[in-house]
């Protein structure tokens, strides 16, 4: 025989053995389960009789004389008092003894009927017949008293509930009288405090703050006599010095060389109307430009003024012109010192 055939036969035999072993073990477990269930059902039947006998309530004979009736009433009252005065551990002990079904083995001799919990609802509905205390004619029927524990318990509650009702009725007229009385005048309601006290400070805040005096510092850069600055040369020189064409159609020198930063000084055309046309600089010409700075200015005024003086000198050098003061005089060292002294 081939080796593969032998291995296949051995595998089939092993599978058959495993299936047979599984079926056999399953049947054995089922048989053990049914045996345990039958034993479990037999135990409650054997233990049910003592509990049934213990749960039978006592039926007193109501036709007994007065002494026997008094003894019966004491027998029902003493277990109740004993159970109320006992500790919580003693109260839970009969409950644990009254459930024998949870134990594997149960001895019927250990059942104590006197420790079973009493049915208090049945005791409350018991009618007790007492003998007549007064001497009456023979043949008079005894008076029957019905004991209702619920009425005795609810009576104090009704009294305590009705007491606040009368007190509330008495308090209502007092409250109405107090409301009708006029409220005493307090110094808070005086008309003097209703006057607008804060009108003067509000008026002071509404007044605009006095504007700071404005001043202009100006320099001229002019071409030589009988000559002019041409547009392309002027635009190139202004771009090299960091000027940007902007508001008012003139060039501005900003604090941070960006349009977002404030302008510190500007350049305007001397000729009217004093503006520039960046798209027509090829045909543009002028005799000079004016550099001016308005005070107060952003940043350090003295540093900004020095920067404007240096820009005027550089612009005159690139265009071949010269710098003049506001009085159209030559801008020399003395004039520069006088300009710096103004800030």
UniProtKB/Swiss-Prot annotation:
Gene3D superfamilies: ZipA, C-terminal FtsZ-binding domain (3.30.1400.10). The chain crosses the membrane at residues 5-25. Residues 39-98 are annotated as: Disordered. It is found in: Cell inner membrane. GO terms for biological process: division septum assembly; FtsZ-dependent cytokinesis. Residues 43-62, 72-95 have a biased composition (Polar residues). Its main location: membrane. NCBIfam families: septum_zipA. Essential cell division protein that stabilizes the FtsZ protofilaments by cross-linking them and that serves as a cytoplasmic membrane anchor for the Z ring. Also required for the recruitment to the septal ring of downstream cell division proteins. This is Cell division protein ZipA.
